[in-house]
């Protein structure tokens, strides 16, 4: 099974755009690091920067909900893309996001259910529906 999960910080606000066919696409980068004890002192160790791509409702909800610097959990699959730059073939590996959300270890979050169109429902509507 090709599934990967990351916990890290978003390096910039997600960028939302739409394909010619109307599908929502959001891209963002997650910086992953951990703390390691070296010579008796704790140090931050950078594990890498991971490009993430979300589609459709996940893309729209991520763009509305996530901001630069937030700590998030990302679940998805590794995808290798090939493209050309000035006639030279290049490859990149990115995470095709299936799930993303805030890491609640050091933060809190308010969750609002999305409507069928992908936009957040108002809290008044949720209260009327018994949410």
Per-segment meaning from a language model:
Residues 7-10, 30, 68-79, 97:
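OB-fold and OB-like beta-barrel modules that bind single-stranded nucleic acids
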Residues 1-2, 17-22, 37-42, 60, ...:
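Acidic, gly/ser/pro-rich intrinsically disordered tails
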Residues 3-5, 49, 73:
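Intrinsic-disorder/low-complexity, polar/charged segments enriched in Ser/Thr/Lys/Arg/Asp/Glu/Gln
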Residues 47-57:
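Beta-strand/loop nucleic-acid-binding surfaces
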Residues 4-46, 82, 91:
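Core FKBP-type peptidyl-prolyl cis-trans isomerase
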Residues 92-102:
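A short hydrophobic beta-strand segment most commonly corresponding to one strand
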Residues 55-90, 103:
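Beta-rich strand-turn-strand
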